Amino acid sequence: MARTVHCIKLNKEAEGLDFPPLPGELGKKIWQSVSKEAWAGWLKHQTMLINENRLNMADARARQYLLKQTEKYFFGEGADQAQGYVPPQS
């Protein structure tokens, strides 16, 4: 049976992650209160930030930036938006 959590991002009960996605306290906090659906949304947003800002993931500063953005995305005022990004029109 799938584990359910009250997702802090989607504000609803949803299937939880199978394991903490990051090491340390932030990973544990995400595992306890973020759904698979919300995590998938973060991965898309993270990819956009990496690509649009041309982040080099071998650079420790880029990794620290993404960790801060992860925390802001789920538990703060929201992550940064990529400069010049325009969402597709439906």
UniProtKB/Swiss-Prot annotation:
One Gene Ontology molecular-function label: iron ion binding
GO biological process: cellular response to oxidative stress
Pfam hit, one: Iron_traffic
Gene3D superfamilies: Fe(II) trafficking protein YggX (1.10.3880.10)
InterPro entries per record: Fe_traffick_prot_YggX, Fe_traffick_prot_YggX_sf
Swiss-Prot/TrEMBL keywords: Iron
GO cellular component, one term: cytosol
Superkingdom, taxonomy of origin: Bacteria
Segment forming the signal sequence: none
Functional summary from the UniProt entry: Could be a mediator in iron transactions between iron acquisition and iron-requiring processes, such as synthesis and/or repair of Fe-S clusters in biosynthetic enzymes.
Family the entry assigns: Belongs to the Fe(2+)-trafficking protein family.
UniProt protein name: Probable Fe(2+)-trafficking protein
Organism (species): Cupriavidus taiwanensis (strain DSM 17343 / BCRC 17206 / CCUG 44338 / CIP 107171 / LMG 19424 / R1)
Lineage, opening ranks: Bacteria, Pseudomonadati, Pseudomonadota, Betaproteobacteria, Burkholderiales
